Every structure is written in C-alpha cells, then in structure tokens.
C-alpha cells in the first residue's frame, strides 16, 4: 500500500489536457537546454540488459530487478534500474572524447519502490553521461555542472510560465544553489534523520546540492545508500528543490563524477563486495579501457511535478496504484493519469 498526503485545499493549476500539453513542452524544452549546456548528443538506450553483465544499477543493493528468461538466447535478462554503468560503456563504444557526452530517455521498473506522492514503480528520467579528464575529477567541476543543470531547469520554468499564465504567479524557483556536504549536514542537524536534514536545509535555501553521498559519516552511518561501482562517493551529489505543494524537498537529480580504478577498489571493499571486480564491466574499468566520466539522472516526472506545482507523481505519469490511493485522489480532486 502506498502512503499518500493530499495538501488541504490543493487544486491543480492546469486542467487535465493542459497538463498533458505542458508535460510534452517540458520534455522538449528542457532536453534542448540540457544538451546545449552540457554538450550532449541523444542516443537510444536499452530497456533491459543481460543478467551477470554488471551493467545494471544495483541502487542501494537490496532492490530486486525485474528478471525474465530469453529462451532464444538461453539467458536471463533484467529490466534496468538505471543506465549509470551502461552509459559509460556506451561512451567508450562511441569513442567520445573529453567534453563530449550522451543523453537518453531512460524508462525503468523498480518493483520494490515504496509508493508515495513522489515515488512509483515506473521511473522515467533523462540519463546523461560525458567524458571528462583526470583534472576535472574535483568538487569544483561537479559544482559547475550543477549550476548548468539548475540554469536549464529555471530557464525551462521561465518559458513554461510564459506559455501558461496560470503558472506565472504560483511557480517560483530559486536560481541560487546552496552547496553542503553530507557530513556538514549531519553536523548542522545532529538529531535529525537524513531526510529531515534535507528538508530543513532545502526549506531554508530553496535550491540545494547535497554532496558526498554513500560513505560512512562520523555517526557511523551513511547519509544514503549508493552502489559502490558508479559514483565516486567523495565526488557525487543530489540536487533538490523546495516543493511548496508538499512542503518538502523534492530530489530532482542524483549525479556524480564516476569511480576511477582506485575509487572502485576502495568502494567495493567498503561495501563488502570485492568479487564484483571480476564482472565484465568492472574489468574494463579497472584495466583503464573505459573513459573517465561524470553523469546522472534527472527525473522527468519529478521535473514536471516541480514546474507544474503538482502534489502527486500520478498526475504527470501513468503507473499502478492501490485502491486506497486512487480513492483518496478521487475524493480530493487529484486526477491521476
């Protein structure tokens, strides 16, 4: 069963068809601005990968992929959780050089997702990746890229508010980004849970970037789980915006500079899975075949929620919901797609 909260007095700013029209515009406008800012080229991506290839994203390490047999190949395949590792391999395959990158529409099924206003089992995002140099593996370069993404989000919002006057006086994004590490966040709010820390900081600043996610903090616990074999835990981040309709932080993007060989070995050991180094993808990384990269995912439904002031992800995407959620939305005038 999902957990749902409908704000008192909530009303969608746009009707059902205008919502669909706006979703289409957001996806077109933002992708163009993102590609221009980060020098990305659009490519086609897989919906599934071979089990055991090491290409699927293990997320927090406990989520089960949707798997199925392929009799013609005598193999098992998995629906992707994300394309974090596939994109890096693709950049190697295409022979891209530093400064060049790719973007794709990623559609995934996350069967173990806990459903609520922001989460469904269907995930749609722009997955992007670009080749970088060793000198660019710094927090400063990470922050420069965050600014580029936030600028693209705000510019998209500006165009949308011009096309839909109903949004003009109701949607306001903060262009200034407040950066903080997870350790600084824990030091600042020692008695809060990680989610409470994110909400407190985002409510104060509007647009925030939380850096260095995955490693253990002074408390002995990580801020959040991250797979050990794509992001470098010292060079990654989440971008969050304060979302007034739900009075909470809305995570729009998880991104980072990817592991090099040293970081991969270190993080596999820390995660207790050093044997993963024997998988095909990991061997290519460890022997220096794969390029140094950075990348991330930007939620398409999340961006639509943010720019349209929506209270439930089901207002901007089609997914599956339990009867109680459907009834609660119907009673509150929330139109699920």
Task: Give residue spans per PLM region.
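Extended, charged alpha-beta segments that form solvent-exposed binding/catalytic grooves
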Residues: 104-196
């Amino acid at each position: 069963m999902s957990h749902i909260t409908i704000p008192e007095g909530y009303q969608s700013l746009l009707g059902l068809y205008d919502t669909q029209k706006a979703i289409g515009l957001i996806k077109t406008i933002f992708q163009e601005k993102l590609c221009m800012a980060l020098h990305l080229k659009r490519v086609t991506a897989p919906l599934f990968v071979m089990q055991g290839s090491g290409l699927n994203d293990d997320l927090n390490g406990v989520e089960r992929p949707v798997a199925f047999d392929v009799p013609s190949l005598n193999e098992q395949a998995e629906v992707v959780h994300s394309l974090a590792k596939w994109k890096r391999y693709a950049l190697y395959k295409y022979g891209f050089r530093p400064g060049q990158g790719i973007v794709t529409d990623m559609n995934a099924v996350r069967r173990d997702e806990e459903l609520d206003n922001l989460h469904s089992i269907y995930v749609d995002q722009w997955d992007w990746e670009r080749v970088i140099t060793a000198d660019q593996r710094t927090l400063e370069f990470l922050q420069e890229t965050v600014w580029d993404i936030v600028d693209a989000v705000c510019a998209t919002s500006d165009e949308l508010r011009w096309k839909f006057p109903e949004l003009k006086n109701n949607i306001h994004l903060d262009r200034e980004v407040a950066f903080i590490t997870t350790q600084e966040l824990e030091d600042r709010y020692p008695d809060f849970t990680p989610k409470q820390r994110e909400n407190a900081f985002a409510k104060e600043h509007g647009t925030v970037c939380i850096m260095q996610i995955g490693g253990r903090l002074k408390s002995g616990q990580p801020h959040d789980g991250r797979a050990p074999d794509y992001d470098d835990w010292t060079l990654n981040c989440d971008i969050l915006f304060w979302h007034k309709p739900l009075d909470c932080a809305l995570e729009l993007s998880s991104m980072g500079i990817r592991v090099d060989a040293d970081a991969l070995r270190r993080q596999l050991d820390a995660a207790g899975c050093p044997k993963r180094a024997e998988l095909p993808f990991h061997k290519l990384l460890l022997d220096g075949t794969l390029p140094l990269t950075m990348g991330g995912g930007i939620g398409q439904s999340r961006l639509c929620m943010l720019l349209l002031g929506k209270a439930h992800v089901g207002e901007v995407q089609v997914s599956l919901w339990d009867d109680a959620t459907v009834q609660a939305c119907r009673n509150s005038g929330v139109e699920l797609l």
